């Protein structure tokens, strides 16, 4: 079956039962050696043997967040989804305390609110010590009733988010649950019966009647007092639960604000970086334009100078050619009359006069 959920398993709270464990924790469990070697092919019957071998409980630990065998068996139970009767037998098992906690943890994840209170509250009377592995890999001692208290009042246990649980007094008002009875109430009644028997043996009937009446009144007062104390305790549990939930919400809200501030800061940083890049591109573009203008002006000046040099070189040649031409046609004769006659003859196409 590998890591797939049993095809016959029903959805829990509208989703695959394995999804009650967060994906990152699920992935750590799938990659763990205990899951691959010890949990492969387990059924509801063979799971009991593995549960009896547990010697501690806990979630993930160490730098790589390795899962404990307890957490692996929880995921295996979600995968195969044992029947409710088997889970109840786990909880009622007095011989193996870790089997009891395993069943209570699974019922807290998958059971209804009424079943959770009905089967887990009697475990408040189990004061046996259990070992719990902390997140740093060290062990600490706790008690079964403290683990049950954590399951009923906290939002997280063993790195798994607990489903929302209705308040007990709400279920009592709706008639789904009866007021919780303390186990100490039976001890009080036994002591009162002993006192009554001693009073009957020692005193007269008047004293017996008086003692018979007074214990009854005291018993009623004690019952009322215990009932009120239980109700106050339940309200304290609910108040602590609400305070923890509000604290978690405030923490998540602050984390959300912090993420928004980080996003705004990153966005401003990217905008400023883009502006700097645009300024750099503009400066580079201006620098190239100035360089082109300088090169163009230099080329124009160079061409102008070359043209002037050519003109300066050609003017003496033209003057020389003009002088030579004037010598040939006799227009430069020292005698003005002869020079005038030569100009006239040149215009007529005749040879010039030399003397």
Swiss-Prot record:
The keyword Nucleus applies. Probably required for the first pre-mRNA cleavage reaction catalyzed by the spliceosome. Residues 182-355 are annotated as: Disordered. Coiled coil: none annotated. The modification Phosphoserine is found at residue 204. Residues 185-208 have a biased composition (Acidic residues). Residues 290-303 have a biased composition (Basic residues). Interacts with SR45A. GO terms for cellular component: spliceosomal complex. Keywords: mRNA processing, mRNA splicing, Nucleus, Phosphoprotein, Spliceosome. PANTHER family: PRE-MRNA-SPLICING FACTOR 38A-RELATED. Belongs to the PRP38 family. The keyword Signal does not apply. This is Pre-mRNA-splicing factor 38. GO terms for biological process: mRNA processing; RNA splicing. It is found in: Nucleus. Residues 209-227, 234-289, 304-343 have a biased composition (Basic and acidic residues).
């Amino acid at each position: 079956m590998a890591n797939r959920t049993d095809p016959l398993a029903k959805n829990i709270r509208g989703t695959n039962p394995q999804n009650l464990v967060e994906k990152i924790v699920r992935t750590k469990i799938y990659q763990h050696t205990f899951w691959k070697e010890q949990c492969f092919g387990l059924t509801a019957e063979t799971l009991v043997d593995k549960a009896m071998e547990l010697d501690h409980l806990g979630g993930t630990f160490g730098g790589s967040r390795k899962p404990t065998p307890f957490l692996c068996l929880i995921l295996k139970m979600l995968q195969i989804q044992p029947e409710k009767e088997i889970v109840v037998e786990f909880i009622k098992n007095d011989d193996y305390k870790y089997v009891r906690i395993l069943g209570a943890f699974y019922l807290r994840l998958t059971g209804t609110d009424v079943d959770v209170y009905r089967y887990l509250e009697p475990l408040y009377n189990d004061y046996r010590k259990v070992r719990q592995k902390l997140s740093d890999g060290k062990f600490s001692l706790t008690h079964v009733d403290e683990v049950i208290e954590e399951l009923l009042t906290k939002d997280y246990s063993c790195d798994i988010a607990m489903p929302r649980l209705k308040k007990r007094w709400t279920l009592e008002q709706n008639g789904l649950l009866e007021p919780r009875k303390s186990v100490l109430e039976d001890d009080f009644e036994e002591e009162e019966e002993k006192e009554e028997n001693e009073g009957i043996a020692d005193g007269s009937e008047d004293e017996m009647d008086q003692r018979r009446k007074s214990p009854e009144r005291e018993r009623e007062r004690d019952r009322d007092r215990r009932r009120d104390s239980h109700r106050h305790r339940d309200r304290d549990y609910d108040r602590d639960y609400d305070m923890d939930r509000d604290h978690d919400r405030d923490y998540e809200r602050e984390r959300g604000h912090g993420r928004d501030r980080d996003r705004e800061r990153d966005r401003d940083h990217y905008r400023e970086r883009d502006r700097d890049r645009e300024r750099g591109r503009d400066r580079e573009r201006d620098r190239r334009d100035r360089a082109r203008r300088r090169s163009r002006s230099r080329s124009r000046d160079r061409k102008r100078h070359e043209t002037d040099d050519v003109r300066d070189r050609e003017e003496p040649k033209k003057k020389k050619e003009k002088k030579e031409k004037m010598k040939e046609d006799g227009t430069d004769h020292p005698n003005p009359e002869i020079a005038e006659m030569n100009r006239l003859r040149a215009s007529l196409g005749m040879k010039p006069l030399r003397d």
